[in-house]
A protein has these predicted regions:
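Short, well-ordered amphipathic alpha-helical segments that serve as non-catalytic structural scaffolds
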Residues: 82-93, 147, 246-248, 278-293, ...
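Active-site-proximal alpha-helical scaffold in enzymes
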Residues: 82-96, 144-147, 152-155, 161-195, ...
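Conserved small-residue
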Residues: 15, 33, 86, 107, ...
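Condensing-enzyme catalytic core mediating Claisen C-C bond formation in acyl metabolism
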Residues: 10-14, 37-42, 219-299, 411-412
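Flexible, low-complexity linker/loop segments at domain and module junctions
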Residues: 1-13, 97-102, 294-296, 373-412
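Conserved catalytic cysteine-centered active-site region
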Residues: 2-9, 41-84, 104, 113-177, ...
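Acyl-CoA/ACP chain-elongation machinery
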Residues: 186-232, 265-279, 304-311, 326-376
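ACP-dependent fatty acid/polyketide chain-elongation machinery
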Residues: 1-71, 93, 249-261, 349-363, ...
Length: 412
């Protein structure tokens, strides 16, 4: 997907909203990124239950005013996080909700898992108290499309509304698909992003795979350590990220402030294995995103989940695509952990905040980096610098690979 063309077909980012373990305001999150401050904490109940992995990057909206009962009764945390992030994004974009009450406005919000808690809670109630005590609205709270559906109902969205469910690329796919719909002339504005909730049983399942970090429970802020020699798995996380995407014509017509242009999007499937990342697939998605030409990116926000295999395969992909001229890159997961289907959206927002504020966040590697990263331009400590073009990479189970290319807006 290339972005250059008429104002109607060019796609720009005009609003950002986030719910994360780093905070729920853009300035708080940007400050945490710049300071290298981790949002990962130990979860005491997981220690008590004997989980091997006892750390998480847990988001919270407890300090945020709830929605009306009319809407809250249909929301689990996946939808709730997404709806708050969407509200923040619309406020940031200065876009009146009335503008969404049109078949030209949509919501595409990815989620890798959905709201598992609702299934478990309903089953527990039915088993312990009887079937007649089961809450009536479990299905809309738990269905895989709950995030996009709840946002559509909350804001009266009249256009496209659906949820990409493609593991850890779900949020990136939402951004890419939204951009494609706008570019094709099917939508004028789309709320796009991803959301994921934490649940004990979801953690248990990843723990059973040996996918999660378990060696740093006593030092949780060091547990997610992309590219470290002693990394031992990813740190599960939760939260949401929503971007307001508009056609350039729509944004200019209302005098919107523009963060960036979606300059490219790449998506592909690698068939090397269900849970095995593979450099050729990651590289293919990157190439598709970059196929419109233009300058080499100044910065790459890597997926780098802090897994022994995933980090190295992505390094191989970077070398394959850029050769000896790999751009500066870092992984923000060292501070946030891995929020699964929300990661692509949150990391696009992190990248745009760095672009806005003129810095590149460092990577929480620890003292000893993997030999595979030797000689590569990994940014280990936060540094000031202008980002004109950035690439954000995502990949996940099932071989799904995605990349989003973002150009800083210069008013042209």
């Amino acid at each position: 997907m290339t972005a250059f063309g008429s104002e109607a077909s060019r796609v720009v980012v005009t609003g950002l909203g986030i719910v994360s373990c780093l905070g729920n305001t853009l300035d708080d999150v940007a400050a945490a990124l710049r300071a290298g401050r981790s949002g990962v904490r130990r979860i005491e109940t997981w220690r008590q239950r004997g989980f091997r992995s006892q750390v998480a990057g847990a988001a919270s909206v407890e300090s945020v005013a709830p929605f009306s009962r009319k809407h809250e009764r249909f929301m689990g945390d996946t939808a709730r996080f997404a709806a708050h992030a969407a509200t923040f994004a619309l406020d940031d974009a200065r876009l009146d909700a009335d503008a969404l009450r049109s078949p030209r406005a949509g919501a595409i919000v990815g989620s890798g898992i959905g709201s598992m808690a609702e299934y478990d809670d309903a089953m527990a109630i039915a088993t312990q108290r009887g079937l007649d005590k089961t809450p009536p609205y479990v299905v809309p709270k738990a269905m895989s499309s709950t995030a996009s559906a709840c946002i559509a109902q909350l804001f009266g969205i009249g256009g496209v509304s659906y949820t990409p469910a493609s593991a850890c690329t779900s949020g990136a796919l939402a951004i890419g698909h939204a951009a494609q719909l706008i570019r094709a002339g099917c939508q004028d504005v789309v709320l796009a992003g991803g959301s994921e909730a934490l649940h004990d049983n979801m953690t248990l399942m990843f723990d059973a795979m040996g996918a999660l970090s378990s060696a740093f429970n006593d030092t949780p802020d060091c547990a997610s350590r992309p590219y470290a020699r002693d990394r031992d798995g990813f740190v599960i996380a939760s939260g949401a990220g929503i971007l307001v995407l508009e056609s350039l014509a729509h944004a200019r017509a209302r005098g919107a402030r523009i963060y960036a242009e979606v300059a490219g999007f790449g998506q592909c499937t690698d068939h090397a294995g269900m849970a095995t990342p593979h450099a050729p697939g990651i590289a293919s998605a990157m190439r598709i995103a970059l196929e419109g030409g233009g300058p080499r990116p100044d910065y790459v926000n890597t997926h780098a989940p802090s897994t022994p295999l995933g980090d190295v395969e992505e390094l191989k992909a970077l070398g394959d695509v850029f050769g000896s001229d790999v751009p500066a890159f870092s992984s923000t997961k060292g501070m946030t952990g891995h929020p699964l289907g929300a990661s692509g959206a949150q990391e696009a927002i992190y990248t745009l905040l760095m672009m806005r504020d003129g810095f590149i966040a460092g990577t929480a590697v620890g003292s000893d980096a993997d030999p595979a990263v030797a000689g590569m331009p990994l940014v280990r400590d936060t540094r000031d610098g202008t980002i004109e073009r950035a690439l954000s990479i995502s990949f996940g189970f099932g071989g799904s690979c995605a990349s989003v290319l973002l150009d800083a807006w210069k008013g042209d």
